[in-house]
């Protein structure tokens, strides 16, 4: 199995041991975060979704068993491997009863560590394949980050109600997908979802689109047209870029919301409508109200329930999932056998700033698939702005040769032991002769 995008948290109050493990695991291609106490580990688990936790049993303040219990309370699905000394195997048995997936005896045998990690991750992935992922893929939303999980929980809470929803987020973050998810999860899901981008139309056209018009109401009105409010009757009306509408349209929209009735352009007939309204904007409407550009009463009518859609910068851990999702789509569409991204290309995607958010990522992946002549997308197929993104030192996903990794780990152990080769070999679980042989390569 590949190790790209697998996040491991190492928990140990021995900083030197943490550093050695980090170098080793990164050399095997894993993403590694460190925690030097149980408290730090819990903070990180709250902030990030990890694929696996590697936790020492003997720690000051909060031991490994207590840390394990708290981690399982926060996320029961996360696999935890416990590290223990020979003298505390009974503690390892207790850890297994508490929910640990397996345990490792210290000093660690690197081959056994690698095999145990592979086994634990394979076990987790087989469970994931049998249970629905927290991606809301039925709504076209992909992600496992805490920010995405929070968004999905908000959607689940808001959807069953009849409350008006105001969705705020930068352009390209997927505000319409959120609106569609709310509608699809609501009691109105069998009725129409009607959408309209308010920024795409001038005032007169927007009025006609929203409320409809009679035949002959204006030049070109050769037949009567029902507006979007009437089309959405019984269902949901989604108005995108609501912050761009004119003062006159704000007045008309406010009346429609308050009275639950509309009037076609050129008609005196009042039409009652039963519509749930969802609006979206990239603007700060509270600031627009303070500046006098948006009506305060309309703002309060719209902002009954507010949902903030995170930018792609706020959910970077979802970028590999999103990139893979788009890659599969465009590879099928272009009938290309694309296997994936090179580690360098994925590094660039993860560290790029994404001012255009998900829409920009989608376009970048489509472009790369179209230009690709090989099997893996590299930096050559990415737009220049992305390909020139600086990668912070030590955060590359490139996999180092095993010989280099072993040498780094041995040097770290020697530094920890003050250059004592015998002690370094003992802590690494190898003979002094083996240590010297590996150093000389």
Swiss-Prot record:
DNA-binding region, residues: 421-440
Inducing stimuli: Induced in response to high concentrations of Zn(2+) or Pb(2+). Expression of the zraSR operon is positively autoregulated by ZraR. Expression also requires the RNA polymerase sigma-54 factor.
Subcellular location per the Swiss-Prot or TrEMBL entry: Cytoplasm
Phenotype seen when the gene is deleted: Deletion of the gene confers increased susceptibility to five classes of antibiotics and to some environmental stresses targeting the envelope such as acidic pH and osmotic shock. In the absence of stress, the mutants show no default in membrane integrity or in cell morphology as compared to the wild-type cells. In the presence of drugs that target the envelope, the mutants show enhanced membrane disruption and abnormal cell shape. Deletion does not affect the minimum inhibitory concentration (MIC) of E.coli for zinc or copper.
Origin superkingdom: Bacteria
Domain Sigma-54 factor interaction as annotated: residue spans: 141-370
Protein name as it appears in the record: Transcriptional regulatory protein ZraR
Activity regulation, per record: Activity of the ZraS/ZraR two-component system is repressed by the zinc-bound form of ZraP, which probably interacts with the periplasmic region of ZraS.
GO molecular function, one term: ATP binding
Keyword flag Nuclease: no
Residues in Response regulatory domain copies: 7-121
CC per GO annotation: cytoplasm; protein-DNA complex
Residues noted as binding ATP in the record, renumbered to the chain: 172-173, 329, 359
GO biological process, one term: positive regulation of DNA-templated transcription
Post-translational modification: Phosphorylated by ZraS.
Major location (coarse): cytoplasm
Subunit structure: Monomer.
Sites bearing 4-aspartylphosphate, chain numbering: 56
Role: Part of the Zra signaling pathway, an envelope stress response (ESR) system composed of the periplasmic accessory protein ZraP, the histidine kinase ZraS and the transcriptional regulator ZraR. The ZraPSR system contributes to antibiotic resistance and is important for membrane integrity in the presence of membrane-targeting biocides. ZraR is a member of the two-component regulatory system ZraS/ZraR. When activated by ZraS, acts in conjunction with sigma-54 to regulate the expression of zraP in the presence of high Zn(2+) or Pb(2+) concentrations.
Record keywords: Activator, ATP-binding, Cytoplasm, DNA-binding, Nucleotide-binding, Phosphoprotein, Stress response, Transcription, Transcription regulation, Two-component regulatory system
